[in-house]
Amino acid sequence: MAKPIVFSGVQPSGELTIGNYLGALRNWVKMQEDYECIFCVVDLHAITVRQDPVALRKATLDVLALYLACGIDPNKSTIFVQSHVPEHTQLSWVLNCYTYFGEMSRMTQFKDKSARYAENINVGLFDYPVLMAADILLYQAKSVPVGDDQKQHLEITRDIANRFNALYGNIFTIPEIFIGKAGARIMSLQDPEKKMSKSDDNRNNVVTLLEDPKSVAKKIKRAVTDSDEPPVVRYDVQNKAGVSNLLDILSAVTDKPIADLEKEFEGKMYGHLKTAVADEVSTLLASLQERFHQYRNDETLLDNILRQGAEKARAKAQETLAKVYEAVGFVAAK
C-alpha cells in the first residue's frame, strides 16, 4: 500500500532556530517512517524579500546540511531546491487564474510583511500563497505539516484545489493540515506572547541551531519569566507565558512530560530552570552542529543529493502538470 504523501519546506532566509527544529524538523524526521516525504528548500519564496545573492546561495546549502544533520534521510525522503523544479512556477501561473484578488487581499501574512517591508511590497509577496499552493498540489500531498501562522495559506490551497476540481474533475488531492504536538509553538525568549521566528530583528529573542554554547546560555538565562514571589515553576500559558515557554523547550528537548518537570522544579528558583534549559539545549546543539559541519564541508555530496532530489521531484511534478495542462485545454508539446 502506498504511503500518504507529505510536503513541506523551509525558506533559506535567516538562521533556523530551535523553534524550527522542535516544531518542524524533528517531526519531519519521525514522519519519514509512515509517509512518503517531500522536503523542499523554498528559495523562490525567499526572494519575495530582498536577498543578498551570495548569502542566499550559502543559506540554501546551509538549510540542506541542517536537514541532513537533523536526520532527514535522502534515501527515505525527496529533498530538493524549489528553483530546480520549474513545474512549481508553471503550476503557480495556472492556479493564479483560478484564485481571486479578494482572497489574496485577506491574507494576514501579506499584511504583516507589507508593514515590515514597506519599501518592497512586490507582487511576489502578494502572490506567495498561490506559489505555496502549487508547491503542495504539484505532489498530490495529503498532509502538510505547518505552524499556526501558515494555516490560512493551507486553507486557501484547499479552496483553490476544490475550485479547480469542481471544474475539471479530481485533478488535485485536497491536502490536510498536520500539526505536530510536541514543540509546535516555541515562543520568543524576550516576548513569549509571540512565536520564535528566524526573521526576528531582535536576536535575543531566538536561539539558532548554529549558535555557540556561550551565546545560547546567555540568551536563555536572560529569558523573560515573571515577578512572582516566591517564584513558582508552573505551566500556565495565560499567566506565566515566559516560564511556560521554558518548560515547553525543556520538555521538547528531554521528552519529559510537563507535569514531571513541574514536580522536578517545585520550590526551585527560575534560575535553576534556565540553567537546565541552557544545558540541555547546548548539548542538543553541539551534537547537531557536529553533524552539520560534516555535511556542509562536503559540497559534492550536497550537490548530488540536490540533483537526485530534483530528478525525483520533477518526475512526480510533471505527471500532475500534464493533467492540469490537459484539463485546461493546452496543446501538449510533442
Curated annotation (Swiss-Prot):
SUPFAM superfamilies: Nucleotidylyl transferase. GO terms for cellular component: cytosol. Keywords: Aminoacyl-tRNA synthetase, ATP-binding, Cytoplasm, Ligase, Nucleotide-binding, Protein biosynthesis. A motif ('KMSKS' region) lies at residues 195-199. It is found in: Cytoplasm. A motif ('HIGH' region) lies at residues 12-20. It comes from the Bacteria. It catalyses: tRNA(Trp) + L-tryptophan + ATP = L-tryptophyl-tRNA(Trp) + AMP + diphosphate + H(+). Its EC number is 6.1.1.2. PROSITE patterns: AA_TRNA_LIGASE_I. GO terms for molecular function: ATP binding; tryptophan-tRNA ligase activity. GO terms for biological process: tryptophanyl-tRNA aminoacylation. It is an enzyme of class 6 (ligase). Pfam families: tRNA-synt_1b (PF00579). ATP binds at residues 11-13, 19-20, 147-149, 186, 195-199. Its main location: cytoplasm. Homodimer. Catalyzes the attachment of tryptophan to tRNA(Trp). Belongs to the class-I aminoacyl-tRNA synthetase family. NCBIfam families: trpS. This is Tryptophan--tRNA ligase. The gene is trpS.
